[in-house]
Structure formats: structure tokens, C-alpha cells
Amino acid sequence: MVYVNAKNYFCDSIINNTDRVLSALIKYHGLSIIAVFLLAIGLFHVALKVVSYVAVLLDVFVLPPTNYLPYGSQRGAWAVVTGASDGIGKEYARQLGLRGFNVFLISRTESKLRELAQEIAEKSKVETKFLAIDVSTDSPQNYKDIETVLETIPSVSILINNVGLSHSIPTPFLETPPAELHNIIAINNLATLKITQLIAPKIVESVKEARATKKFQKGLILTMGSFGGLLPTPLLATYSGSKAFLQHWSNALAVELAPEHVDVELVVSYLVTSAMSKVRKTSALIPNPKQFVTATLSSVGRAGGAQEKFATSTPYWSHALLHWWIAQTVGVFSKLVAGFNYKMHVDIRKRALKKQARQAAGGVADPKNTTAAREGYATESLKNETLKH
């Protein structure tokens, strides 16, 4: 609230000072009303850009980390994490455990979930539960199993919608296998919506009970977005559309649940290192899962680079600056950006096809192009080398 008030005060000061300057120009320099009006528009536009950029810097580099006590940290509340067995999802689970939340892990591979649950319980001294399901099947039994576990959990305050799947390689929409289309939508959209529809009522109920006893104050739903949803991404059209859908759905849900004291945010990410991506080396633009999740959980409630959107955050510093620059210059829906994305993914596709051909000639199967890899329950962080968006 203090941050919002300071930002509003800064805007008001610019407007008031601009008004005085323009009045002086008319009175002492004889500028016409039209000239002054056009100048005012230009100054106001520049002022908004300055305020927006300052807000990014404050969000990313200056403001203190988010306080999780209002969300039930160290007060018996549970966090649910989907896609929790690897990458970003695994790191969300670890860091929420360290913040004092009991953790319910949902993913596909039971052995990985069991190992992670044991690790979190030992290191963070919290309770853990896990459930192995394959959401690509969209089986009603999956959701019955989730409900069964939820019945054993007294209080849920956080949901991390991290599960996600993309194309095996950049592919024209007309050449995309129907099974791949189905799996992307089933995992990214249907599973996310159905799991949220199961868990959000539990969060609302838990928050009401906690507020009555002054145990904690609010709930939180974070959904993983992507630059692929922020920017139209040719050759990854279905994935791009699925993430764009999550943007609007999450924003609408944020308005619906605000009266229930549940914060809802979409988290926008660029590429993050992972085992499947084979991008093992971090850089200024490519963090590892720990770096990305630390930035995300430290800045809940702040827009970062997503200053043009509400209930949306681009938290990692380099992603934030890139997002802000694109949005404030050419625009996320510009033909220039779409054309650049298209050329980039055409090149990535060519290299991926050449690699597949070399492996086929050598009798080596590409593990990222197997049915399991394409149709598996992958976390958002498990993007292959084609997802440079």
C-alpha cells in the first residue's frame, strides 16, 4: 500500500508540475494553445514511461521480499504444487517448505515425488503429501484422487499451477500431430482449470476460517505463464495460444476471487535451465530454477516487467527488463515481433530436424522426440531447446 501511494504521489507531482510549466509557456512565450496541447501530450507520455520504468526498477531491485505470514507461513497452512517433480515446480515446493508451508506435491513420477517429499520434510520440518497422476489423460479419476487427498488436509492457502507442456520441436500448426495438440491443451488448460476449480474453494474456505481466528489473512494462486503466451509465437502456435488463454483466465479469476481475499497472479517467464532443455549454463537472460523461483516468491504482488498488465508479474530481473522494453516500444502484438519470432523458430526447427536426422542415421533415438517426452506430464521449466521465447 505504501508503494502504491508513493507511485500515485509521483504521478500527481509530475502532472501538477507539467501544468505549471505549460501555463508559463502560454503566458510568457506566446505558444498557441494547439502547440501547448501537443507538447502536453508528449510530456505526459514521457512521464508515464518514466514512472513505469521506475516502477520496474523498484519492483525488481529495491523493494523487500514478500511477507508470507499473511498467507499462513509457519501457521499450519498447506501449499499445493503441480508439476512438482522437476525444475521450477520442484523448486517452488522446496522454497515454500523453507517458508514454513506444508506441501502437497502433484506430478507424474511417483519415485521423484516420494524422494522430494522426504527431502522437504527433513530439511524444512513440515508435513508433506504427494500424488502421482498423468493429467494428459484428463481422467475423472485424477480429480477424484486429488479430492481424496484434499479431504485429509485441514487448511490450504497456496496453489502453484506449474504443470505445462509444449511442442517437441517448432512445427507449423497444419503439421502438428493431433495427439500433440490434445496433450498441450489437456495439460496446460484443462488440467490447470480443473485442478484450480477443485482447490480454490478449499483456499477460500480456509481463508475465511483463518481470518475468523486471526490465524492468517489471505490465499494465493500463482499460474505459470510464458513469453510464448505474451508474444504470438509462430511454429509454437498451440502452445502460445494455450499460455495466452491462461493470461486472460488468470486475470479474470483475480477479479472474481479478490473479494474472498485470495490473490491470483500469472507469472511470466522466459527460458529457464533444466535437464530436458539441455540448456545447462545459466546466463544473464537464462536463470536456473532456484534463481527464478526465488525472484518469483520474493516479489508476489508486484508487476516487475509486466507494468502494462494487472494481476501479472514478470519477476526475474532480465526477463522483467526485456518484457518492459518490448511492451513499451514495439508492443507485444506487433507484426515486427511476430516476424522476428517466426524467423527464430524456423531456424530452431531446421537445426532440430538436422539433429534428428543425424541421430536416426546413427541409430540413436532422440529422447526429447519420443512419445513419452511429447505426451508426458512436463513442468513449465522442462522446456526443450526449441522454447527460446
Swiss-Prot record:
Positions of the UniProt region annotated as Disordered: 359-389
UniProt-listed Enzyme Commission number(s): 1.1.1.330
Pathway(s) it belongs to: Lipid metabolism; fatty acid biosynthesis
Gene3D superfamilies given in the database record: NAD(P)-binding Rossmann-like Domain
Family label: Belongs to the short-chain dehydrogenases/reductases (SDR) family.
Stated name of the protein: Very-long-chain 3-oxoacyl-CoA reductase
Residues at the active site: Y239 (proton donor), K243 (lowers pka of active site tyr)
Bilayer topology term: Single-pass membrane protein
Top-rank EC class of the record's enzyme: oxidoreductase
Location(s), subcellular: Endoplasmic reticulum membrane
Originating organism: Yarrowia lipolytica (strain CLIB 122 / E 150)
Stored Pfam families: adh_short (PF00106)
SUPFAM superfamilies: NAD(P)-binding Rossmann-fold domains (SSF51735)
One example GO MF annotation: ketoreductase activity
